[in-house]
């Protein structure tokens, strides 16, 4: 590899307004790229900046607001900024948990979008050294019954219902297919239907795992000369620019973006889990990072930035399942079930042997360098040479205009809403109509597709208010500690009052956990909103942050991490502001968990 002091620079590309538009880079952002590099970028460098500065990866519109959230308590071991948050649950054990969105991919390709959403959140958990213990999901779809649809055009209504049915079936099958094959219990969650989600479903996946408190791993590179090892599935062309796609609203033709959606393999992920946990036990791993959004690009620059070091990577060594892949394609591919790790120099064979045992690719593709730069080589040529900080901490940060949110309805019901009430009204018919609603009727038809008992830790599965798992090896035999977990969100309430609606989401998730007998101790959030370039949307977002902060502070449940999903709009029509909260609580004795059903 060329030395860090070499005058060789990547070959510049011809940058046009059309090329910048294709990469969703503004003229102002391109000026920042020129300033960071001191020259015209190569095409590979432009692609790297495109994904790392996307809303999905950089949080450039939301970071200024997220700072207002409470993130610390005596139980918090790791807060926001890592692959997952971690809390201390006692007896030397810690719990890693997080919620993430996979909304845009699940609209374009429902099965794979939802499946890879589950796969991605599971990797976030075991990247920390934790074995996944449970998953849950919070889902939002358009109407699936004619009575719930509001479109007056019968033909449009029929097309909408047909499309929504296909999305629901694909998403639920994807979640079940991945989780069941991987071997992690699904404890349910919540599913709601509203017309505003017809063109933009929400698929928020939550996962939780256990790790010994002294065996936690972090996504940080260190140690000059340490080898950088690529492990897992081979790299293909699937998912290229997936992070950029997730940072845009849907327009006509968005369904043609199927190549941007990743393809998952739960059996490969199961092998990757076991191999990673076994390799961690060797003591030879210095740092490890999932190749999630932005793939190899994100994992290399984030590991380097966290450690204040650089990485030199040779793309010719990256295992590839397709021929003729360019450096641009390899760096931006979001092929699933892949990890990047840094091993101690001289102990790399210990790590490689573990992955060979599990039948997985494991290849040394680079080395840690003292210079804080990401340098990429392909066919012997330097194709990218970028300061790590310019991709991460120095990414654009926008103070978007925050408008004034006005409730869309009067606080008091109009007179006509009360006119039909009285003793002559058929209230039994009203009750039957309510019970038939997709939002009220049983969701058993969904959660019965999920395996909720695998691993034999489940105390309370789907169908109740919260899931409960026992923590083997804690407490006393037969009276182990337990973890309770619940998800909650109400877009309608947040639409009427973003701050109060967000507070209700926190409070209801905490109540669900408390109803099992557990003490709520920490939270994770998934913030689903529309286009942040609209002041009224930022008004919703800012108010929701204030509501979450106030409620979490009052309840003593700090935010340990989460996800922001913006641009949830289709043809200019946004979803309801939908903050979803995941709350985790601790039970001193899992056998004393209180079920949701009557017992006597």
Per-segment meaning from a language model:
Residues 2-600:
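Glycine/proline-enriched, intrinsically flexible loops and inter-domain linkers
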């Amino acid at each position: 590899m060329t030395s860090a002091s070499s005058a060789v620079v990547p070959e510049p590309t011809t940058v046009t307004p059309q090329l910048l538009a294709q990469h969703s880079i503004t003229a102002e952002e391109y000026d920042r790229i020129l300033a960071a590099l001191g020259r015209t970028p190569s095409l590979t460098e432009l692609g790297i900046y495109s994904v790392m500065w996307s809303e999905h990866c950089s949080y450039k519109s939301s970071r200024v607001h997220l700072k207002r959230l409470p993130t610390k308590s005596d139980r918090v071991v790791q807060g926001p900024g890592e692959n997952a948050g971690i809390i201390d649950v006692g007896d030397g054990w810690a719990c890693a948990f997080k919620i993430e969105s996979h909304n845009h991919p699940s609209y374009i390709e429902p099965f794979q979008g939802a499946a890879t959403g589950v796969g991605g959140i599971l990797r976030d958990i075991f990247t920390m050294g934790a074995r996944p213990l449970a998953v849950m999901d919070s889902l939002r779809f358009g109407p699936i019954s004619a009575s719930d649809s509001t479109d007056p055009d019968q033909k449009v209504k029929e097309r909408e219902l047909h499309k929504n049915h296909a999305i629901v079936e694909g998403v639920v099958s994807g979640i079940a297919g991945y989780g069941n094959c991987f071997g992690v219990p699904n404890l349910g969650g919540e599913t709601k239907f509203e017309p505003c989600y017809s063109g933009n479903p929400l698929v928020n996946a939550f996962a939780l795992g256990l790790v010994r408190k002294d065996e936690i791993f972090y996504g940080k590179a260190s140690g000059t000369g340490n080898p950088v090892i690529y492990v897992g599935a081979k790299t293909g062309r699937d998912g290229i620019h997936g992070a950029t796609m997730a940072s845009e609203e849907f327009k006509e033709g968005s369904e043609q973006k199927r190549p941007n959606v990743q393809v998952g393999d739960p059996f490969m992920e199961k092998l990757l889990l076991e191999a990673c946990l076994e390799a961690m036990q060797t003591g030879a791993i210095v740092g490890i990072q999932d190749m999630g959004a932005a793939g190899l690009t994100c994992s290399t620059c984030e590991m380097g930035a966290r450690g204040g070091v650089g990485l030199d990577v040779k793309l010719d060594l990256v295992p590839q399942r397709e021929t003729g892949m360019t450096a641009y394609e390899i760096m931006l591919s979001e092929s699933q079930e892949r990890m990047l790790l840094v091993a101690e120099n001289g102990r790399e064979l210990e790590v490689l042997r573990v992955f060979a045992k599990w039948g997985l690719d494991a290849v040394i593709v680079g080395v840690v360098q003292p210079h804080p730069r990401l340098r990429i080589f392909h066919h012997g040529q330097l194709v990218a040479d970028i300061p790590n900080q310019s991709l991460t901490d120095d990414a654009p940060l926008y103070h978007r205009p925050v408008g004034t949110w006005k409730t869309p309805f009067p606080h008091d019901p109009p007179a006509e809403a009360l006119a039909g009430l009285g003793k002559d009204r058929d209230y039994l018919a009203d009750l039957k109509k309510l019970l038939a609603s997709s939002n009220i009727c049983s969701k058993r038809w969904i959660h019965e597709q999920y395996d909720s008992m695998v691993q034999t830790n489940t105390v309370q599965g789907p169908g109740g208010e919260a899931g409960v798992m026992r923590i083997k090896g804690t407490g006393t035999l037969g009276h182990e500690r337990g973890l309770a977990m619940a998800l909650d969100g109400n877009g309608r309430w947040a639409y009427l009052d973003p701050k109060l609606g967000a507070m209700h989401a926190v409070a209801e998730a905490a109540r669900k956990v408390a109803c099992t007998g557990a003490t709520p101790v920490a939270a994770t959030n998934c913030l689903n909103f529309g286009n942040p370039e609209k002041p009224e949307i930022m008004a919703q977002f800012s108010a929701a942050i204030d509501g979450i902060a106030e409620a979490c502070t009052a309840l003593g449940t700090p935010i340990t991490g989460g996800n922001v999903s913006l641009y949830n709009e289709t043809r200019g029509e946004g979803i309801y502001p939908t903050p979803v909260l995941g709350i985790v609580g601790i039970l001193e004795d899992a056998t004393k968990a209180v079920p949701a059903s009557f017992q006597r």
